Amino acid sequence: MPRDPRAWLWDIQQAAKRVSRFLDGHDLPSYQSSDLVRSAVERQFEIIGEALSQLAKHSPELAAAVPRWREIIGFRNMLIHGYATIDDTRVWRIAQIDLPPMAQAVDQLLGVP
């Protein structure tokens, strides 16, 4: 039985909320100095990227409504395959700049006010 595409949107929504929660109270230097927070945030971006990848395969019109979805999938691939060269500043920037509008779009797709 095929998965309901909204399930991938829900996965994205929940992972985005976790990123925001994990980063609450941190600035870039404190983020960079915490292995635990960095690992947690990176894992959530892996989930977001994989969910977007599956959404793009099974419901491309929904994926297209998520800002920068292709870039986030590429970012997920970099986290998975380029783990030895992750740029903490890039992760931080994506979390601070790119994630909020993406999360807002996903909320709208899910009908969350």
Show which residues each predicted segment covers.
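Solvent-exposed interaction patches of small proteins and small membrane subunits
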Residues: 1-113
